[in-house]
Curated annotation (Swiss-Prot):
Family: Belongs to the peptidase M28 family. M28B subfamily.
Cofactor(s) this protein requires: Zn(2+)
Main location class: secreted
Keyword annotations from UniProtKB, A to Z: Carboxypeptidase, Glycoprotein, Hydrolase, Metal-binding, Metalloprotease, Protease, Secreted, Signal, Zinc
Function: Has both folate hydrolase and N-acetylated-alpha-linked-acidic dipeptidase (NAALADase) activity. Also exhibits a dipeptidyl-peptidase IV type activity.
Protein name: Probable glutamate carboxypeptidase ARB_02390
Reactions accelerated catalytically: Release of an unsubstituted, C-terminal glutamyl residue, typically from Ac-Asp-Glu or folylpoly-gamma-glutamates
UniProt source species: Arthroderma benhamiae (strain ATCC MYA-4681 / CBS 112371)
Residue numbers annotated as active site: 414, 604, 665
Any one GO molecular-function label of the UniProt entry: metallocarboxypeptidase activity
Region listing for Disordered, in residue ranges: 255-279
Binding site for substrate: 197, 516-518, 530, 675-676
Amino acid sequence: MIVKSLSLLALAAATVEGCVRERDVGSVDILSVLSKRGHGHPHLPHLSKYESMLINSFDNTTVDSWAYYYTHGIHIAGTNQSMAQWTADKWTEFGIPSSLVSYDVYLNYPVSHSLSLTHPDGTTWEASLVEDVLKEDDTTSYPDRIPTFHGYSASGEATAEYVYVGRGQKVDFERLIQLGVDLKGKIAIARYGGPFRGLKVKNAQDQGMIGCIIFTDPADDGNVTVANGLKAYPNGPARNPSAVQRGSVQFLSMFPGDPTTPGYPSRPDSPRKDKSPVVPKIPSIPISQLDAQPILAALDGHGTPGKEVNRTRWVGALNATYATGPAPGAKLSMSNVMRDTYTPIWNSIGIINGTEQDEVVIIGNHRDAWIIGGAGDPNSGSSIMVELAKAFGKLQKAGWKPKRTIVMCSWDAEEYGLVGSTEWVEEYLPWLKASAVAYLNIDVAVSGPVPDLSATPELHKLALESMKKVIWPYKGRQDTTMYDVWNTASGGEVGVLGSGSDYTAFVHNGIASLDTGAGGDGNTDPVYHYHSNYDSYHWMATYGDPGFHTHVAMGQFLGLLGYHLATDDIIPFDVTNYGVQMTKYLDVLKKYIAASKFPDLDVSKIESAICSFNVSANAVAKLQKKAEHNVHDQQLRKHLNTIYRDFGRGFVSQGGLPDREFYRHMLYAPGLDTGYAPTTFPGVTESLDAGNRTRAVEYIERASNAIYVAAGILSSCHDCNQFVAQE
């Protein structure tokens, strides 16, 4: 999830890395803009009794205590059933009956690894591959702390000359080939950022390379660097130079979940398929900027200098020219030993029964982390989920009964490839298709002060209205709303969902979804140590969110969303916004086509389908107004809720996208060469990228048909046209 709030015009260039967005709002001085608007308490909409009770139920002291618990015990996927049970027990204690749902999945764990550089003169240098122990940060010294490694990486050894491949995108490799760089049989060294890390490894593998090293570059830290005079963590907000980003290298753009059970749940007796199409065959190792420095410097003067490569973000901020190499006689030797296993994982599932059994709202966060801590990813969200359970419990004691059933989920094994949530969706898909109204996801709830939002279009209006009800503690201010800060930082644009967190399986089964969190501005806020030992309770309490006040505000926002989706008589969807957003997606597609090999490609079928959708959506909006005024017409309200629940299923096409049938939504999907960042009308754009006109025409047809199906569901309300005529 990377570009802060995704500009539609930048979709093709957008890139994503991990569960957090790659932000760049440094050109916007948020605090200055807010200050110019004046002080004083913001005008808040009237809050209902239950809204006020919900908001007032969140307490920073108890959130702090939940965060401390989650960040002081190992909880890499499949290793801590007691933490899953503790979560279920806490939810139950607060009035939400909860239990564990387990799956037996393929995972792998690190045994040993090494990396060394041999110079042409025969001298050698050994990489540390270890993050420094900090006396100020207790969990960095735990004896069972997790080594630096890549989940789903291949075991293997490799010794060879090496090539710097930039961010490891396909276009980076294409540029290297243009420059005459021999890649086959070499080891790749790539910097983080851009495509999902697994695709960096895949792209190297596809070029015949035999290993891949991925490092973190300080150029991605904006102005918050030691070079700019700031101190490194723990003494200041800059990145600790020994920090290493762990993470999965599954080929996420192909499909998420257990690589051995695509399309069906992983039970002990489930048949297993070959995992090789979606996991690497070559070894990979993540390293720190400290370890990367001598490796890059050894390439200076060999191959093409970085500035002459002419690729975006090729040159970083380390003391090297970022030359391509290879350097004759300079070789890397790498060893990576992993233990493959099938192991149980545990989802904690809690249920608040509603009065309408065929309408369900799901709220989820993953619990597993690559490190002991995980204070931001994911346990800022986990602590909020416990506090949300407490808040919902208080509402129930006060007499609240939701109209729709609420299912709360604490997922396991998200980090390996959205495994826990995907297996659960695959098991319960018939029920979800028949009942699910929406899925709300919170992953990295807090890693900084700037709120962020991505959602399917029907949820935009509810989200923005809810933001205006939450006081946002931006850098100590108490006179501004969440909406004010978000709107200033994002320009008012809600992001498009691609992949990278647990909403993925819901989106691609046509279920309305939303993902939210808060992070740094990418330029001036303290650097977030993503997937590092330094994503710790100490970092969060000192730099990320001292006092845990942003946690509280984010929990209030999530609570309001869940409350209204579960309680409002009419599901609070804005279906007309789907037409607005599809028109924007189409404008992007037209520009993409104009720059392609087939500029004459006709998209009039999509235009006609969107027009048909708009007619149906506008008719339903009129019906909603009628139902709101006629509170006694429960039949009409039920019809409206049914079509609101179901219309999104229409955008899902059987067979999915070319060569990746898991991704079935015809309007958006993770980019084939990004892994996380979204592409709109993906079947068409991928066909254009492949130079396949016939297939592009096919996916124009399939996309337009999907839009017509969704429009038809909106029009399926009994005598809808008659209702509109009576208006």
